[in-house]
Amino acid sequence: MRVPVPDVLLPAEALGRVHFVGIGGAGLSGIARIMLARGIEVSGSDAKPSATIEALRALGATCYVGHEAGQVAGADTVVVSTAVREDNPEVVEAARLGLRLLPRSAALEAVMQGRRVVAVAGTHGKTTTTSMLTVALQHCGADPSFAIGGDLNEAGTNAHSGTGELFVAEADESDGAFLVYSPYAALVTNVEADHLDNYGTEEAYREAFVQFLDRIDTAGFLVACSDDPGAADLLDLARERGRAAVSVGLGAGAEVRAENLRQVGSTSTFEVVDRGRRLGEVTLVVPGQHYVLDALAALACGLRLGYPFADLARGLGAYSGTRRRMELKGERNGIRVYDSYAHHPREIAGDLEAARSLAGPGRIVVAFQPHMVSRTRIFGAEMGAALGAADEVVVMDIYVAREDPVPGVTSALVADAVPLDPEHVVLEPSWSATAGHLVERARPGDLILTLGAGDVTLLGPSVLALLEAEGPGDDRD
């Protein structure tokens, strides 16, 4: 559900006891962690048990599994996840009691107040860029607070309340949440139509980024990728308005750009040029050109904040990934199994490029779960086209999330658009059968990749178990 943003946004310390409805999610759990670290009393509930809930309990939060009206008792503020329905008993009870209701965006703004905020926005690459910047700053000796949409491997968490003045935050545009923040600096990775279930039109989606630009501190700056047409338009607009803006990219026109890019296996090495000055090399241990662009944005931001190139480069080289971003789940019988959150055509293409680099002479076997009916209706054909970069594709049923089914909008829109011979594409509604298809089609040296923003992430362990059961030495055609 959507909770309106209040006219007056209070700092976290003024919210009293805070109860989170949907505390186990990536967004709310991070905010809860930060509040707990600052001594704020926190409680919360979620539909099912999870490792996240157990971790929050260990930090001092009172966490419930299941939703009941009485669980908001004693709270002063109730933060509500967008995944929660309006008839949720805790939300209904909070409204009846007249408690302060906040959306996630307002709660994040509350913990960011008083800090120098760097907000990372964009259609794709937000989580990775936020993570890279955080690790790079840490290697410069800084201790920034951060809130990220996935667990940072180096920290083992998605959020941290640091001792420094900086707060690095992933700024989600999906429901307009990023228009609540007032950052000192902003990074925009790209701007490409998405979340049209909320925005209605591509023009409205792009206009939201223009409004986001206007929220940047006049003393601050924008970093954006000039290789991306949407982000390049934002750079032009910023300069027209007299705002400080830095372009990054692979193109010759980028102020901070990568040259002499070499990609071998899981590493990418490139030379950084900043307005004609050669600063040195960066080597990333995560594969794919899209990660190079994310690293350039993080690097350019760190440089503009006054940190030395050598330390930033060392931090970027140490970045080992974020959960669900080309995450290696395991290897059995010479077959590696990866998982990734990619669900938009451009994200799918980027991850398959990275997978091709990782696979080398091996083949790529993909299970893709389309995310949301509205996105599949609009982008289904483009998703299918992007999946053509794999060798074997299994398309699962749509993960409908918060939407209702729509007649005629099915995973077939994706499967029918995959430009591979029919014997290499399977439309499979059965979860267990999907795992079987992947194992049946993969052979030693191949790479299995599960893709999607839904519960397809849970498929990896099943695939590994099937591979384990088969044992080594299985001969396949």
Regions found by a protein language model. Name each.
Residues 34-37, 57, 71, 82-226, ...:
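Phosphate-binding loop of NTP-binding sites
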